[in-house]
Amino acid sequence: MALNIEEIIASVKEASVLELNDLVKAIEEEFGVTAAAPVAVAAAGGAAAEQTEFTVELASAGDSKIKVIKVVREITGLGLKEAKELVDNAPKALKEGVAKEEAEEIKAKLEEVGANVEVK
């Protein structure tokens, strides 16, 4: 049986949407394939982009809560009440979008007075 491509294309052009849908389903079943568009897989980059902005998060105040509140006030510029609320409601973000060096300095200051700090 010789295939005439032009006749097949002409038949497809004349078919209704329902007939074409049935044709696709029949082809999928007959050949075990799917008509779904392939999903593009993101190419893995050589190295992950280096993070440039960090968030300093107070995990807990530790044993010396008053000292931690003082350092939080110094770092954030918050008033006493706001700094106390922040420390009481830990874990909370202290500073967001800071450079790595500044984040490490803040972490060191807080850990020096007994706080548990995470840099994300």
From Swiss-Prot:
InterPro entries: Ribosomal_bL12, Ribosomal_bL12_C, Ribosomal_bL12_C/ClpS-like, Ribosomal_bL12_oligo, Ribosomal_bL12_oligo_N_sf. One of its GO terms (molecular function) is mRNA binding. One of its GO terms (biological process) is translation. The keyword Ribosomal protein applies. GO terms for cellular component: cytosolic large ribosomal subunit. The keyword Membrane does not apply. Keywords: Ribonucleoprotein, Ribosomal protein. PANTHER family: 39S RIBOSOMAL PROTEIN L12, LARGE RIBOSOMAL SUBUNIT PROTEIN BL12M. Homodimer. Part of the ribosomal stalk of the 50S ribosomal subunit. Forms a multimeric L10(L12)X complex, where L10 forms an elongated spine to which 2 to 4 L12 dimers bind in a sequential fashion. Binds GTP-bound translation factors. Belongs to the bacterial ribosomal protein bL12 family. Forms part of the ribosomal stalk which helps the ribosome interact with GTP-bound translation factors. Is thus essential for accurate translation. This is Large ribosomal subunit protein bL12.
